[in-house]
Amino acid sequence: MTAARPRVLIAPVTVTPTKALGLSHLKGLLWVDVMYRATRSLGDCDVDYLYSNTTFNVTRQTAGFWEYLDRACGNIDLSAATEGDVGLLYTAFQTQSDPPPDAALLPYVRAVEQTGWTHPVSRRLLELWRGHFAWLGMHDPGLTRRQPPQLAFNEVVEQLAKHDLCLDTRKEGGPVYLDATAQGLPLRPLTSLTGHPNYLGCALRDLLPAVAQYDEIVLLHDRELTQDYILLHKLFDALGGARTHRVCLDRVPLDGAVRSSRHGVGHEHTVTGLAGELRTYATPQAVRLGMRLYFIAGLGKGENGQSYRQDLLRQSIDRAGKLLAREDSPQAPDAAAFLHQHTGSRNHVDAYRLTSALLRRHQQVPLRATATTVYL
């Protein structure tokens, strides 16, 4: 009898369609893309890429922004808005002195839950992002597709309660808490005081059932969310089932400082800005490989705090062009064997180890074969 193929879920933080894609977003998306495509190319496991805007469109970050647009910008024609235009509005939304109550978001939440509705401004952004994904050769995980979460939030609460992992104080006018105190972690609210689920509460609507459906779950997140993702890791271990791995990425510093997109980002530090600078700089293949060499192997996970440098990005693109111009050596291993070298004891490929290996000077590497499958 043939053993079942391992099932792997790659689950990054979903970028909400409320602002321009910046360099930190790009780094994470490239990292996930390489991991997903390389793991899929192993051929010995089934891999899924969880990225659902539908799940997170009910959060205050997104639904609240939509409410702000309709209330404060209703007379502005945003049908042809650029990412920069939307980014400025998002900054204004984040700095408003009197945020609306959760009740004001309910019409938007209902529309998302019942029909998968997306505000026209976010639809506009997602179409622009699809263009970025196509330019960079990234797999589209369903940016504009309706992808309802597997569980209703109340079902999440019920399942957590069965395992004594939840403290529900809604009847007393408080939030729902994720309770991992038995694992030595503090209570973490999953909702507001009025019961509106936050980002973590929404994430569990897809991730909680995945624990029983997959053999391995890879959680990718930025460092600012580390405590929440340690909590998820502990939660999944307590539930049993899938082995869980975390990949923590630092945001990309600009001149030594990490800046949040909620405070605005300069055009030159967005994917749109990079596209304007690099679209004619080199061949599309060199740009795609070079971007991955820089944002994955060059910057790494980010522990060294290296700031973004356009000159080094261009050097990586130049190097990518030279590497792609060479024929693979007959002595190089085949691409599948090369990919397997960078899994360790896990079912997924380590994007950093694989990408760094392409730059080895004294080892035979099937670069063109690997690039065609994973990087282009």
Residue ranges: model-predicted function:
Residues 1-376:
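NTP-dependent nucleotidyl-transfer catalytic core
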